[in-house]
Amino acid sequence: MALAGHCECGGIRFSVDESALLGTGYCHCSICRRLSGAPVNAWVAVDPAALAVAGAPALYRSSERGQRAFCPTCGSQLWYAPDDGSFLTLNATGFDDPEAPALRPQVHIFDADRLGWFEIADSLPRSPDGSLPGG
């Protein structure tokens, strides 16, 4: 099943088949917090080869490990791409149906960076860094 999404202004659209999803979760790192403007960022990791994009996103090198894509018109953050090209993490809230069961977060990463005043009361696995628990 195809999962589609877009930036706020609609200038950039994307889609990916559900079979290309590699994982979902919440990121508590300071970069995701600043760029999303929220205390946590919900992400969906996908195989980069499976992502179809219409429109031309702008790129921003957010760390020594990778870059972010965003809409040059409305500024919506679209995805993070590590330099090794092994995956992309799309913002879960950018999908047309962010409540689709396949997009439900399954893990917390960078939990050691979580803001002390913010807590999500769930039983999902938590990783203190960017590694996936059990991975």
Question: Which positions does each model-derived feature cover?
Answer:
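A short Gly-Trp-Pro
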Residues: 1-135
